[in-house]
Structures are given as C-alpha cells and as structure tokens.
Amino acid sequence: AAEPNPTYIAFSEKGNLYSVGAEEGKGGIASFTADFQPLNHVVEEGAPLCYVSVDDKRQLVYGANYHKGQVLVYQLESDGRLSFVDQDTHQGSGPHANQASPHTHYADLTPDQYLITCDLGTDSLHVYDVSEEGKLTLINQYQIAPGAGPRHLVFHPHYKTAYLINELNATIDVLFYDGM
C-alpha cells in the first residue's frame, strides 16, 4: 500500500486502513483493504487533512483539515471505499500569532457517540450530532483559554474525564464530561 506523504492513519473494525496524505497540491483520504490493497482515494484541492478516525457503528470516517479549518465526513461503503458526505468550516481566530484562522486539528467521537473537534486556531471544541447518513449538526461549542491552541483530546476509559492537550501554551486541561 502506498499513500504519498501520509500524516495520520486509522483502522476500521474490519481491518481496513484509512490514511490521510497529499500529492501534487491535493489532499485527501485513501482507503485500503485489510491486506493493504488500494480501494480508492478521495481528494480535493489544497492542503491535506491532518487527522482521520473511523465510526464503525454508523459506517463513517471523519477527517480534520488544519489548513482549511474543516471537519469532513465520508461514508464507508460496504467494500471499504469512501464517498464524501458532509463538512463544516469553523470560523474565527485567536490571539496567538499562529491563530489567524481556524485550524481543526482533531475529529473523533465522544464516549456517547457525538463528534468532537479541537480547533487550535479558535481555541475551541465543537460538538456535533451526526445523523446515520453522516450529516453534521453543531450542538455545542466550548471555549478554551485564549491562546491555548487545543490539539488533541483523550477520554478516560472509566471516568467522566477528558484530557485536552493544548499546543500553543503547552498545557493539559482536565475536563469533566457528563455527556450531551
């Protein structure tokens, strides 16, 4: 299997591999079988995605595009191929020199199956309801300390706690998560 300039990978429960990368001014997500045979490559003009995650329950794949400030949703077809479904583009900026525009850095599921994104450029977390078809509805936004630059979020496996890594001020926020 080959993906030019890969930056992040994720696996489905079936063992398919999804990789984000870029080639010749286009970025996207490539899909591969469990034995690493190429299935398809969904690309778009401009900067590549920086994060990919798989929602096996709804048969969706989520991507974060740092340079465009976007979260993207792809449908997982029965053979593992991807097709584009929906996207949301964040708005705003932050006080740090690296925060002139939105920079979506992470897109993954909460323990109760909502999609959450970290936006380094706007110092915010966005929470979305995701329909079975992959359509996004923004339902909440949480502001982090100005200039923090949220990058990645990890939920504790047993407690109602999430750990947020902030890149720009080199901190970790410990958040209480009681669901939506």
Model-based region annotation:
Residues 32-33, 74-75, 129, 175-176:
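Structural recognition of the beta-propeller blade-terminating site
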Residues 3-13, 45-57, 92-113, 144-162:
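Beta-rich, blade/repeat-based domains predominating
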Residues 115-170:
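Loop-centered beta-sheet repeat module
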Residues 1, 34-40, 78-86, 133-140, ...:
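Beta-strand initiation motifs
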Residues 1, 18-36:
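Beta-propeller domains
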Residues 25-29, 69-72, 123-125, 170-172:
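Structural signal for beta-propeller blades
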Residues 38-106:
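Asp-box/WD-like beta-propeller blade repeats and closely related beta-sheet repeat scaffolds
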Residues 19-23, 63-66, 117-120, 164-167:
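Conserved beta-strand positions in repeat-built beta-propeller and related beta-rich domains
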